[in-house]
A protein has these predicted regions:
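Generic detector of short, well-ordered, non-transmembrane alpha-helical segments enriched
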Residues: 24-25, 59, 126
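Charged, low-complexity, helix/coiled-coil-prone segments
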Residues: 26-31, 68-74, 129-132
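Short solvent-exposed beta->alpha transition segments
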Residues: 34-35, 42-46, 50, 60-108
Length: 153
């Protein structure tokens, strides 16, 4: 995990919160659309679950298909994307277990949190920033991992 932001889809939580706060006024002016409803949250969870399933099968093409357009432009190919996740984000690449936590929004940004147990039994929280596409589907725009002091039992 880097400590600086270079348009990376996976960044530290502090950077995510700072960027969301800075963009709050632009977001408010840009969209008056209602927040996600129960059906949206189910679709968001489905998207995240399917991407993690694809990571576990090393299915780069499918995993990449759940990434938002900005992420796809940055990594250009499914294999570049999978390589980045494999080397830097093993918690979501090969989780031992995960469970969805309560979702929330910050300044209009939709965030789904997951509690993730890593292969070495560390507990982490993954924050997925989701982006609604023009066709109504949800894509993953960013993810950040936050370590927990807890260990899995």
């Amino acid at each position: 995990m880097g400590t600086h932001f270079h348009y990376r889809p996976f960044v530290r939580l502090g950077w995510v919160i700072m960027l969301l706060a800075v963009s709050a006024s632009a977001t408010a002016a840009q969209s008056k659309q209602a927040g996600p409803n129960a059906q949206d949250w189910r679709a968001i969870r489905h998207t995240i679950r399917r991407q993690i399933d694809a990571f576990q099968r090393d299915d780069a093409k499918t995993a990449f298909s759940y990434a938002a357009p900005s992420v796809r432009r940055q990594f250009r190919t499914p294999h570049e994307f999978l390589s980045m996740v494999r080397t830097g984000y093993s918690a979501v690449y090969r989780p031992r277990a995960f469970r969805f936590l309560d979702p929330f929004t910050v300044s209009g940004h939709v965030i789904q949190a997951l509690e993730v147990v890593t292969q070495d039994d560390m507990v982490m929280t993954a924050y997925y920033i989701m982006e609604r596409q023009s066709n109504g589907t949800w894509k993953i725009a960013a993810c950040t991992l936050e370590a927990s002091a807890a260990r899995s039992v």
